[in-house]
């Protein structure tokens, strides 16, 4: 099953880099609409600070350290390590399981450079560009950390003008180790040295791109950057990891995390469990839902939708 899921993800990537005109926020907005249409509630600015356990059953969650929400089931899509830190002490989740989850290594994070382009100054590219410094396409912490050796360039589609790029996103790997000086800081409180670090990294990235014959310099109106710290603080992802827990195709069971937990009404989902990325998250959510609804029932329901 794992190999089949990976083949689906690879096929999806090879077939094309599809974009949402005017951004992917539309997907989140539509999901919110569907949830509300079915009687659900979506809460903003509501951080789960505790998963309440009593008599070895999850009773609900605590929001922002104050408000309690009772529930029959809890599904967590944050990193399993983060989920375990939120759990009340219980006899069902064994120390050996906690130690294994905590020992699993995460993938690298992403440094992202957003270029706001001058109006009608740079053509829209209906494809992604992948640039590599050499024939070795794999980014390695031991040999590549701190260096720009590869990146992806993606122009964002806009309904206002389909011929020119308004925003260009440039992504390059970055481990959180590079940001050790600011590990214990919060957004907007990291100081001038952090801003200088990001500016230097952006310059390095633009120079790397220029060495491949692409020069954005005269077309840039403004620049914005994010680091793995941004992803860590806004999404709760351990180490600001881009793809969650590392999966070894030679030994997949090492990084395997089940959607079920030893607490009967606590379930896990998200890219840390099976396959990473948008398609992986979708597949994993189906597996998690199947635990509640029944896999055969859900498969037929999807098949006849």
Model regions and ranges:
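Flexible, glycine/charged-enriched surface loops at secondary-structure junctions
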Residues: 41, 45, 215-224, 299-303
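A conserved FAD-binding loop/helix module that cradles the flavin
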Residues: 271-293
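Mid-domain catalytic core of redox enzymes
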Residues: 19, 49-163
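C-terminal segments that line or cap access tunnels to active or ligand-binding sites in enzymes
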Residues: 118-226
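Helical element adjacent to the flavin cofactor pocket in flavoenzyme catalytic cores
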Residues: 11-58
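Active-site-proximal substrate-binding core of FAD-dependent oxidoreductases
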Residues: 47, 53, 294-305
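A glycine-rich dinucleotide-binding beta-alpha-beta segment and adjacent secondary-structure elements
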Residues: 211-275
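Single conserved hydrophobic/aromatic residue that forms the stacking wall/gate
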Residues: 1-10
């Amino acid at each position: 099953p794992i190999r089949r899921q990976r083949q689906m993800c690879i096929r999806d990537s090879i077939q094309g880099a599809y974009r949402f005109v005017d951004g992917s926020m539309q997907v989140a907005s539509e999901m919110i609409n569907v949830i509300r249409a079915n009687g659900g509630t979506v809460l903003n600015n509501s951080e789960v600070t505790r998963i309440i356990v009593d008599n070895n059953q999850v009773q609900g969650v605590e929001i922002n350290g104050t408000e309690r929400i009772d529930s029959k089931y809890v599904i967590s899509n944050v990193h399993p390590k983060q989920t375990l830190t939120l759990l009340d002490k219980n006899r069902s989740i064994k120390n050996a399981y906690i130690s294994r989850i905590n020992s699993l290594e995460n993938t690298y994070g992403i440094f992202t450079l957003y270029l706001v382009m001058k109006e009608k100054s740079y053509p829209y590219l209906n494809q992604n560009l992948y640039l590599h410094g050499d024939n070795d396409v794999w980014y390695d912490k031991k040999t590549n950390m701190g260096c720009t050796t590869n990146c992806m360039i993606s122009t964002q589609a806009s309904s206002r003008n389909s011929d020119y790029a308004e925003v260009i996103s440039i992504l390059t790997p970055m481990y959180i180790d590079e940001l050790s000086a600011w590990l214990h800081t919060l957004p907007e409180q990291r100081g001038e040295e952090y801003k200088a670090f990001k500016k230097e990294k952006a310059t390095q990235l633009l120079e790397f791109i220029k060495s491949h014959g692409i020069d954005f310099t005269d077309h840039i109106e403004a620049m914005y950057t994010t680091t793995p710290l941004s992803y860590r603080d806004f999404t709760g992802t351990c180490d600001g990891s881009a793809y969650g827990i590392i999966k070894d195709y030679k030994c997949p069971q090492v990084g395997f995390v089940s959607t079920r937990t030893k607490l009967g009404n606590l379930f896990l989902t998200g890219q840390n469990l099976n396959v990473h990325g948008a398609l992986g998250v979708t597949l994993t959510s189906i597996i998690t839902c199947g635990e509640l609804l029944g896999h055969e029932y859900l498969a037929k329901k999807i098949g006849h939708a």
